[in-house]
UniProtKB/Swiss-Prot annotation:
Known function: Substrate adapter of E3 ligase complexes mediating ufmylation, the covalent attachment of the ubiquitin-like modifier UFM1 to substrate proteins, and which is involved in various processes, such as ribosome recycling and reticulophagy (also called ER-phagy).
Residues spanned by motif Shuffled ATG8-binding motif 3: 333-336
Annotated organism of origin: Arabidopsis thaliana (Mouse-ear cress)
Binding partners and assembly: Substrate adapter component of the UFM1 ribosome E3 ligase (UREL) complex. Interacts with ATG8 family proteins.
Span(s) of short sequence motif Shuffled ATG8-binding motif 1: 274-277
Keywords: Ubl conjugation pathway
InterPro entries: CDK5RAP3
The keyword Endoplasmic reticulum is assigned to this record: no
Pfam families: CDK5RAP3
Effect of mutating W335A: Abolished interaction with ATG8 family proteins
Comment text on domains: The shuffled ATG8-binding motifs mediate interaction with both ATG8 family protein and UFM1.
Entry protein name: CDK5RAP3 protein homolog
Motif residue range(s): Shuffled ATG8-binding motif 2: 285-288
Family: Belongs to the CDK5RAP3 family.
C-alpha cells in the first residue's frame, strides 16, 4: 500500500481541452464563473478609459476587449509602484490603484481567474495560434514563390535583352532609333552587291563555270546535236553586270513616294502650260500598246513612257519574262500625228520645277545612293535565277568531290579521268575546294538574313513597319519585364510588412498561453497541498514548437 508521501508526490495530469470542466466538476470554481467574468469585464471597460496611460508604455499597448487576469494584475502592480501615496485614512488604496485592486480581488475570489485562463488556453491552442501559424506559413510560401518568380523574370530580362541585341547586331543596328538606323543601313547594299559581283567574276567561279560546261559538253552532249547551254544567268550577269544603285521607286521610303508624286504633279503642270495644238479623240484610236511605269530617265516624258521592245538585249535570259505582252510591230502602226514643239515662254516655272526635283533627288540618294537605274539585284526573280545557277554549280562540284575521294571507285575514276579531254583532267579535289568556297560565299551574300531584310526594306514599306514593330516589341518586352520586377519588389515589401504584423501576434499568443498554463499548474498545485499538476495535450507540442522556432 503506497504511503502518504508517495501519494503526495503523485502528479495530477489534466487534459487542457477539459480543464474548465475539470475545475467545475471538482468544485474548484463556481458553475456560474462565466457570468461573473462578464461582470468583471464590464467594469474593466468602464475603468480603462480613465486609466492614466502616460504613466507606463504598457498601458498604451493594451486592448480593453482582451484584458484578462494577467493584464489586470500587471496594471495594478504598475499603479502600486508609481502611486504609493494614494491611500486613504484607513490605509486602503484610493483612486485608480484602488479600483484596479478591486478588479484583481474580483478575479481571485473563488478562483474565477482559473476559469478564464482555461477558456483562453483552449481558444489559443485550438484556434488562435494555429490560424496565426498558417498565416505565417502562407506568407513565407508566397515570399518563396516570389523569389522564384523574380529569378525567372531576371533570366527573361537577360534573355530578352540578348535577343534584342542579337537582332540589332544581325542587322548592323545600335538599337537607339531602329527605323532611322534601318534606312541608313540600306546604304550598305551597294557594297554587298559589289562583293557579290566580285565573287561571281572571280577566277575560281570562272573556273567552276568552265569545268561544269566542259563536263556537260563531254558527258551529256550527244553527237550531231547542238551543245547544251548551261548557266545562262551567271554568264549574263558577268557580261551585263547590273547597276549597284538602289535608287528607284520604293515603298520603303517616303521620300521616294514624295518624289514620284512631285514628278507627276510637275509633269502635269508643264503639260498644262504648253499648247501642243493636238486634238486626240481616244475612242477613234486603238493603241494596242501596254503602258508600264518606269523611272524618269530625263527624256521629259514624265513617269510613264512607251517601252520599245528593241531596247531589251537579245541575249538576255530575262527577255521572255520581262517583255511578255510587248511584241508589237511598231512599223505597222500609223500614228498620223504630227508634233511640232512650239516656243515655250514660261521659262521660270520650268526652272523652278527642275530645282525642286533636284532637291528631292539629292535628299533621297543620301540613303539609297546615286544612279538613274535601280539595281536588278533588288528583284526577287532576278536573284532567284542567279541562285539557281549557283546552286547547280555547287551541287555539281560537291558531287565531283565525293566521286574523286571515294576509295571504292577511285580506280574507275582514274580510268575515266585518263580518257577525258585534257580540260577535265586538270581538276583535282584540291582545285575544286576553293571553287566550292567562293560559290558558297556568293550564295551566302545573296541569301543571308541581313541582305534579304535590307532588300525587303527598300521594296516594301509594310515590311519595314513590321520589322521595326518586331524589334520594338522585343525591346518593349524587356522594359515590361523590368517593370514587373518593380511590381515583385513592391509585393515583397507588402509580404514582409504582413509578416512583421503577424509574427508578434503569434509570439504574444504563445507567450500568454505559456504564462496561463504555468499559472493554472501553480494555483492548482497549491490547492492540492503541493502535489504536482501537469496540463497535458497538444498545448505542450504547440509551445515546444514555438520555443524551437
Amino acid at each position: 500500500m503506497p504511503s502518504q508521501d508517495d501519494v503526495q508526490n503523485l502528479p495530477i495530469d489534466i487534459t487542457f481541452s477539459r480543464l474548465g470542466e475539470w475545475l467545475v466538476d471538482r468544485k474548484r470554481i463556481p458553475a456560474d464563473w462565466r457570468k461573473r467574468v462578464a461582470v468583471i469585464r464590464v467594469k474593466i471597460l468602464k475603468e480603462f478609459s480613465s486609466l492614466p496611460k502616460e504613466i507606463d508604455p504598457f498601458f498604451q499597448t493594451l486592448d480593453p476587449e482582451v484584458i484578462g487576469y494577467l493584464e489586470v494584475k500587471k496594471v495594478y502592480e504598475i499603479l502600486l509602484k508609481t502611486t504609493p501615496e494614494s491611500r486613504n485614512i484607513f490605509g486602503r488604496l484610493s483612486g485608480a490603484s484602488g479600483v484596479w485592486e478591486a478588479i484583481v480581488r474580483a478575479f481571485e475570489k473563488d478562483h474565477i481567474y482559473l476559469g478564464e485562463a482555461a477558456q483562453i488556453i483552449i481558444q489559443n491552442v485550438n484556434y488562435e495560434i494555429p490560424y496565426l501559424k498558417k498565416q505565417v506559413q502562407k506568407v513565407q510560401q508566397q515570399m518563396t514563390e516570389l523569389d522564384r518568380k523574380e529569378a525567372d523574370i531576371k533570366r527573361s530580362v537577360a534573355l530578352s535583352a540578348t535577343k534584342y541585341e542579337d537582332a540589332c547586331r544581325e542587322l548592323g543596328l545600335q538599337g537607339n532609333n531602329v527605323r532611322r538606323e534601318l534606312l541608313e543601313t540600306a546604304s550598305s547594299l551597294p557594297s554587298t552587291f559589289s562583293k557579290i559581283l566580285e565573287v561571281i567574276n572571280s577566277d575560281s567561279v570562272t573556273g567552276a563555270m568552265e569545268y561544269y560546261s566542259a563536263y556537260v559538253q563531254d558527258v551529256h552532249t550527244e553527237k550531231d546535236k547542238p551543245l547544251r547551254i548551261v548557266l545562262q544567268n551567271l554568264k549574263y550577269i558577268r557580261e551585263n553586270p547590273p547597276s549597284l544603285s538602289v535608287f528607284g521607286d520604293s515603298e520603303g521610303l517616303d521620300a521616294d513616294n514624295i518624289q514620284s508624286s512631285e514628278n507627276a504633279n510637275g509633269t502635269d503642270a508643264a503639260a498644262d502650260s504648253i499648247d501642243w495644238d493636238i486634238t486626240v479623240e481616244t475612242p477613234e484610236i486603238d493603241w494596242d500598246v501596254s503602258m508600264v511605269e518606269e523611272v524618269d530617265s530625263g527624256n521629259d516624258l514624265g513617269s510613264y513612257e512607251i517601252v520599245n521592245a528593241s531596247d531589251i538585249p537579245e541575249n538576255s535570259p530575262f527577255k521572255v519574262e520581262e517583255s511578255q505582252g510587248l511584241e508589237v510591230d511598231v512599223s505597222e502602226i500609223s500614228w498620223d500625228v504630227s508634233v511640232e514643239t512650239p516656243q515655250v515662254e514660261e521659262i521660270g516655272d520650268s526652272a523652278l520645277l527642275e530645282s525642286n526635283q533636284t532637291q528631292l533627288t539629292d535628299s533621297t540618294t543620301q540613303v539609297l545612293g546615286s544612279g538613274g537605274e535601280r539595281s536588278q539585284l533588288l528583284e526577287t526573280e532576278y536573284r532567284n535565277k542567279i541562285l539557281d545557277d549557283l546552286y547547280e554549280v555547287k551541287a555539281f562540284l560537291n558531287q565531283r568531290l565525293i566521286e574523286l575521294r571515294n576509295e571504292d571507285t577511285l580506280s574507275l575514276q582514274h580510268h575515266v579521268q585518263a580518257v577525258s579531254p585534257m580540260v577535265l583532267q586538270q581538276y583535282s579535289p584540291e582545285t575544286i575546294e576553293p571553287m566550292v568556297v567562293d560559290i558558297s560565299m556568293a550564295i551566302s551574300l545573296l541569301t543571308n538574313k541581313k541582305s534579304r531584310d535590307l532588300i525587303m526594306i527598300l521594296n516594301s514599306k509594310r515590311f519595314l513597319d513590321r520589322l521595326v514593330s518586331e524589334l520594338e516589341e522585343k525591346k518593349h518586352r524587356e522594359v515590361k519585364l523590368r517593370e514587373s520586377l518593380k511590381d515583385v519588389g513592391r509585393r515583397r515589401m507588402e509580404l514582409q510588412n504582413s509578416l512583421s504584423a503577424i509574427w508578434p501576434k503569434q509570439e504574444a499568443a504563445l507567450s500568454k498561453t505559456r504564462e496561463l498554463k504555468e499559472l493554472c499548474e501553480t494555483s492548482l498545485s497549491s490547492m492540492f497541498d503541493g502535489r504536482p499538476v501537469n496540463i497535458r495535450g497538444e498545448i505542450n507540442t504547440l509551445l515546444n514548437a514555438g520555443v524551437s522556432a
